[in-house]
Amino acid sequence: MLEIIILAAGKGTRMRSDKPKVLHTLAGKPFLEHVLDRSAELNADKVHVIIGHGADMVREALAGRDVNFVEQTEQLGTGHAVLQVLPHLNPESDTLILYGDVPLTKTDTLAELRAKVSDSSMGLLTVNLADPNGYGRIVRTNGSVTAIVEQKDANPEQLKIDEVNTGVMAVKSAHLAKWLPALSNDNAQGEYYLTDIIAMSSADDIAIETAQPKDEYEVLGVNNRLQQAELERIFQRQVAEELMVAGATLLDPARLDCRGSIEVGRDCVIDVNCVFEGKVVLGNNVHIGPNCVISDSTIGDGTVILANSILEESTLAENCNIGPFARLRPGSQLASKAKIGNFVETKKAVIGEGSKVNHLSYVGDAEIGAGVNIGAGTITCNYDGVNKSKTTIEDGAFIGSNSALVAPVTVGKNATVGAGSIVTKNSEEGDLIIARAKQSNIKGWARPVKK
């Protein structure tokens, strides 16, 4: 049985923020959510989140998560924090202790650490740093770990040690039940250090087995916004590398932001400053221009999305053409070879095969058939101030420029709407619809003159 404890009670003073540090984001998701995702991948039987500063905000942020909240009302150190969880632990379980502000530790690293745990051993995640300043040092005797000494308590010889404690450890819950109540706060900080259980473990002949991450960034925590930005770039670089290995061309890998997951087919090209949110799937040979934002959308093979376009919860079939400056809002569904041009907005709109909405239009709550042409400035008037209604435009229809289609309304198959019309009644197949005031030309009219 595996239980995970996540320390998330700290105030994060150096973030200079009104919200708890663990709720600040990496790739659009709170640090704490990243740690919880790793917990889920490890198939933890129970996850305990220690909260303190901003406890209500953390509870609200994790409202959909199956976690046990344990509140640390006084901030008396990491050992004191874990002590609060002790009554909730199964004495037969293995316990993995993680930190809510260390978001990039890999699942494989944690699984390796957990494997170190037995009745006669515990696991400790360490790392060797060129600059260990600020970290607790790993003290070894004849190669075996015997203690962790915090920076402020270290002597000159111990300060030379470059192997440092990451804070992440795995241990039998029964051992924690023995060691935690025996912790002392007789140190420079006057706090109860979780790291003091290492010396207790050594004294009880419980071997301390160490593991190290493949990459140093896995154990980097966040204490300020500069470090937050550094981790963001590390994360985004990883995503960029994965996309390029998968066969995508990134015109500048340093200018990509993924805030969710992205799946790419072969020969995709992604230009600079694109943002991907939620779950995004790109087919083969998809080209995305600069400065696009794509959220929770599926893009079919051969589709081209030009610069400065925004897509949200939309589905595009193959060989569509979007933008520049197009906005597809949730519920937009495009069949193959459909085109949405510049300064066009769609919402809950089904656009048929080969249909075109090329310029300056709004298409909302609409179903458009195949081979339809929507002229510039066309508006589907879908909202009467209370209710939304649907516009239906059947196959082959032609909508002239600057037309307003007042829903609910249907334009028949192969019908034509004259430019500037306000359409309020249904039409049948092949109709010509003209709904505008008759033009008058007044001969000899003189412009007014200033008096």
Curated annotation (Swiss-Prot):
Key words, A-Z: Acyltransferase, Cell shape, Cell wall biogenesis/degradation, Cytoplasm, Magnesium, Metal-binding, Multifunctional enzyme, Nucleotidyltransferase, Peptidoglycan synthesis, Repeat, Transferase
Region (Pyrophosphorylase): 1-225
Chemical reaction(s) catalysed: alpha-D-glucosamine 1-phosphate + acetyl-CoA = N-acetyl-alpha-D-glucosamine 1-phosphate + CoA + H(+); N-acetyl-alpha-D-glucosamine 1-phosphate + UTP + H(+) = UDP-N-acetyl-alpha-D-glucosamine + diphosphate
GO biological process: cell morphogenesis; cell wall organization; lipid A biosynthetic process; peptidoglycan biosynthetic process; regulation of cell shape; UDP-N-acetylglucosamine biosynthetic process
Region (Linker): 226-246
Active site: H359
Cofactor note as given: Binds 1 Mg(2+) ion per subunit.
GO molecular function: glucosamine-1-phosphate N-acetyltransferase activity; magnesium ion binding; UDP-N-acetylglucosamine diphosphorylase activity
Domain of life per record: Bacteria
Positions annotated to bind UDP-N-acetyl-alpha-D-glucosamine: 7-10, 21, 72, 77-78, 99-101, 136, 150, 165, 223, 329, 347, 362, 373
InterPro entries linked to this entry: Bifunctional_GlmU, GlmU-like, GlmU_C_LbH, Hexapep, MobA-like_NTP_Trfase, Nucleotide-diphossugar_trans, Trimer_LpxA-like_sf
Residues holding Mg(2+): D101, N223
Gene3D superfamilies referenced in this protein's UniProt entry, alphabetically: Hexapeptide repeat proteins, Spore Coat Polysaccharide Biosynthesis Protein SpsA, Chain A
Major localisation: cytoplasm
EC number, as in UniProt: 2.7.7.23, 2.3.1.157
Location of the protein in the cell: Cytoplasm
Residue segments, region N-acetyltransferase: 247-451
Database matches in Pfam families: Hexapep, Hexapep_2, NTP_transf_3
Cofactor(s) the record lists: Mg(2+)
Residues given in the record as acetyl-CoA binding sites: A376, N382, Y383, S401, A419, R436
Enzyme class label: transferase
Pathway the protein contributes to: Nucleotide-sugar biosynthesis; UDP-N-acetyl-alpha-D-glucosamine biosynthesis; N-acetyl-alpha-D-glucosamine 1-phosphate from alpha-D-glucosamine 6-phosphate (route II): step 2/2; Nucleotide-sugar biosynthesis; UDP-N-acetyl-alpha-D-glucosamine biosynthesis; UDP-N-acetyl-alpha-D-glucosamine from N-acetyl-alpha-D-glucosamine 1-phosphate: step 1/1; Bacterial outer membrane biogenesis; LPS lipid A biosynthesis
Protein family: In the N-terminal section; belongs to the N-acetylglucosamine-1-phosphate uridyltransferase family. In the C-terminal section; belongs to the transferase hexapeptide repeat family.
Subunit structure: Homotrimer.
Name used for this protein in its record: Bifunctional protein GlmU
